[in-house]
Amino acid sequence: MTLDPQIAARLKRNADGLVTAVVQERGSKDVLMVAWMDDAALARTLETREATYYSRSRGQQWVKGETSGHTQYVHSVRLDCDGDTVLLTVDQVGGACHTGDHSCFDADVLLHPQD
């Protein structure tokens, strides 16, 4: 799968050719996780609506939930004003975090909301 050249031209990638992907749950608006995408992962996500990311440690693409069953159906993808981050709005099945938690931001609260 090839990324549309008009989209590719708008991306500002890091030195490794990746953009940041922020993943938000459609219903709750919770931020579930942050991951990386290369052009091919973004192209696959846009074509299939299956959240696909790039693993820096493994050096390859991975489809969220392919092995765990904790899938993300992508409703929308938005590009930020700088072109270096995409926002995916998803329906999450199971935990989004590799720990099994609903969100990667469930564990440590550094500053609690004021009442």
From Swiss-Prot:
InterPro entries: PRA-CH, PRib_AMP_CycHydrolase_dom, PRib_AMP_CycHydrolase_sf. Coiled coil: none annotated. Its cofactor is Mg(2+); Zn(2+). Keywords: Amino-acid biosynthesis, Cytoplasm, Histidine biosynthesis, Hydrolase, Magnesium, Metal-binding, Zinc. Zn(2+) binds at C81, C97, C104. SUPFAM superfamilies: HisI-like (SSF141734). Its EC number is 3.5.4.19. Binds 1 Mg(2+) ion per subunit. Binds 1 zinc ion per subunit. Its main location: cytoplasm. It is an enzyme of class 3 (hydrolase). It is found in: Cytoplasm. The keyword Lyase does not apply. Catalyzes the hydrolysis of the adenine ring of phosphoribosyl-AMP. Homodimer. This is Phosphoribosyl-AMP cyclohydrolase. The gene is hisI.
